A protein has these predicted regions:
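Mature extracellular/periplasmic domains of secretome proteins
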Residues: 10-14, 92-113, 124-137, 149-162, ...
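Extracellular S/T/G-rich loop segment that most often corresponds to the catalytic His/Ser-adjacent loop
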Residues: 24, 152-220
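Subtilisin-like peptidase catalytic core
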Residues: 53-119, 215
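Active-site neighborhood of phospho(di)ester-bond hydrolases with catalytic His/Asp-centered motifs
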Residues: 113-115, 142-145
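Conserved small/polar residues in nucleotide/adenosyl-binding loops
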Residues: 222-229
Length: 229
């Protein structure tokens, strides 16, 4: 339907409720009570070379919960659909990522956040194709560029918005350019974010944070009244 150079046009018809999918390490089971928001999800795992969809999407690492915390800090009026593919060591595999994106073809979500990157030997034409299919549906895909790198998968694809965090000297939160390899640069400054019960940590000096922050800002655009309303 559109690539990221047309992203502004996607928001002409705004909606009052937005659902974001987060593909990550899951989410803390107290999150929805902490922030009074709707949370649902699944786990996707590879067992004996076979993809399994499971009900467990509890976060054993904290990374996925921090991602959701950054997003809801930008846009409180939001619904989450969580897909857990990373374990307590933040390890996963490309098969689970592909299966997760395929699952989202049939889910009513507006934005897909991937604060992750695939290893350099993880190029797979199936991943590129599924990102395009989701993009053709009008779903916005956001991915963090691998820390310390200028390109990574899936951020490198033209149907995915590639995000990096930096220490910006200028007096603005982000820079966006559709015709560059890194499409969006977000101001990267650590703040306190919820990770688990009674536990807030300083988080923000990484590209995962930057991708989550952009996702939250776009969610806020979705929920804001349109000038054409």
């Amino acid at each position: 339907m559109f690539e990221h150079e047309d992203i502004t046009m996607a928001f002409i018809k705004k909606m009052r409720k937005v659902t974001i999918a987060i593909i990550d390490s899951g989410i803390d089971n107290r999150f929805k009570n902490q922030f009074k928001c709707k949370v649902s999800g699944i786990g996707v795992t590879l067992i004996n070379n076979e993809i399994k969809i499971v009900e467990d999407y509890f976060d054993e690492n904290g990374h996925g919960t921090l991602t959701a915390s950054v997003i809801i800090n930008e846009c409180p009026d939001i619904e989450f659909f969580i897909i857990k593919i990373l374990d307590r060591k933040l390890e996963g595999n490309i098969e689970c990522l592909i299966a997760s994106l395929e699952y989202l073809l049939d889910k009513d979500v507006n934005i897909i956040n991937m604060s992750l990157a695939v290893e350099k030997n993880g190029r797979d034409s199936r991943l590129k194709k599924i990102c395009k299919r989701l993009n053709d549906q009008g779903k916005i895909l956001i991915a963090a560029v691998e820390n310390g790198s200028k390109k990574s998968i899936p951020a490198i694809y033209s149907t995915v918005i590639a995000v990096e965090g930096r220490k910006l000297k200028q007096n603005f939160d982000f820079m966006f350019s559709s015709n560059k390899r890194i499409n969006c640069v977000i101001r990267s400054e650590p703040h306190l974010y919820y990770q688990k019960k009674d536990d807030y940590v300083m988080y923000g000096d990484c590209n995962s944070f930057a991708a989550a922050k952009l996702s939250g800002k776009l969610c806020l655009l979705y929920t804001s009244p349109s000038p054409r309303d």
